[in-house]
Amino acid sequence: MTKQYNIRELENNFERAVFLKGDSVHARETTRYLWARNNIFGKKVLEIGCSSGYGYQFLPKDIDYTGLDYDSKIIEVAKNQQWGDNAKFYHADINTFPLDQYDTIIAFEVIEHLDNGLEIVEKLKKHCKWLLITVPHNEPKGFWGVGSYNDQELLLDKGYLIALLNLEIFLCLNDAFAKCI
């Protein structure tokens, strides 16, 4: 019997997207991962902020995927979804997780939640050949529904975006759908 989960509780009041195996996934999420699938370099892939692991289903099946999230409950969910033999999930903080070398690191809608996001991007760059990042930008208030993001302002200001670009990464800004620079 499949374990049942309270999705609203796991989403932490719209703080994260959570989809279980077999759920339909929002087009916005799907678009991000389809973009990633076409831009993955190599076979060894790390995803920071993997949530329930739903993004794995859109990525090439021949990759060695590691998903990382700070929320132990969501990692339990990811492990129970049985996404695939090549998918491993870990509960850890990116600030202290011992990073290996990866071909590609994915961080979708994560950097803006970190107090030291720019430092983390610098750290990630040292451990991969290809870094795929998306950040929210110009989303209308309430785009994700009433009370989205606990009414926090997560949209990145121009200075932060310029700082990210100065780190010479491949960055996507999420306007209604990803626009890549």
Locations of regions flagged by a protein language model:
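Conserved helix-to-beta-strand junction in the class I
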Residues: 123-127
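Conserved N-terminal segment of class I S-adenosyl-L-methionine
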Residues: 1-100, 104, 108, 118-121, ...
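Surface-exposed loop/turn segments and immediately adjacent short secondary-structure elements
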Residues: 140
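Helix-to-beta-strand junctions that scaffold the AdoMet/dcAdoMet cofactor pocket
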Residues: 114-115, 128
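Conserved beta-strand signature within the Rossmann-like core of class I S-adenosyl-L-methionine
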Residues: 128-136
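A short His-aromatic
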Residues: 109-113
